[in-house]
Amino acid sequence: MTPADPAGLVLRDMSREDVRAVMRIEVDRHPVDAWSSTAFHEALDRPDRYVCLVTSTGPDKSRDPHGRGAGVAAYGVISLAGGTADLDNLTVREDHQRQGIGRRLLAGLLEAAARRGAHEVLLEVRHDNVAAIALYAADRFVEISRRNDYYAPGLDAIIMRRSLDATHG
């Protein structure tokens, strides 16, 4: 998708070879409600989904010449229906957080959604995920609804929305 930035990160499409590395992060970051490897493979196969990831071009790029598998710092999935994109998953490896990687990945996903004809993006986030809510709010997402006890008793989902204007992407 894009060349490496000065920090040595590359935003690119996910491949099947990346799923094993992604699953290690997914289970670590979402131990209770992790996506399955089947869900990632199905997302890769569906034309209404877009899956990308951020990889490091640093010393841990050890799998193959294209960096598949090793060095995965973050990944995201959007699905598209009509003029709306849903941000289904955005996860940053714990040791790569607070470095702007989530912001870069979100920007790439929003650009991909706009290129595919989306006019708005919706997402849901746990009400106690303060860092994610701040990331989304900083990128002009606004809370439009709340689903009480959505994840579990006492764990609400905040529904957020952002318009994609003609200048985005």
Predicted feature descriptions by range:
Residues 11, 124-125:
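Conserved SAM-binding loop
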Residues 30, 40, 75, 135, ...:
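Conserved hydrophobic/aromatic "anchor" residues
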Residues 21, 134-135:
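Well-formed, non-transmembrane alpha-helical positions, independent of function
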Residues 3-9, 13-97, 103-116, 163-167:
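Acetyl-CoA-dependent GNAT
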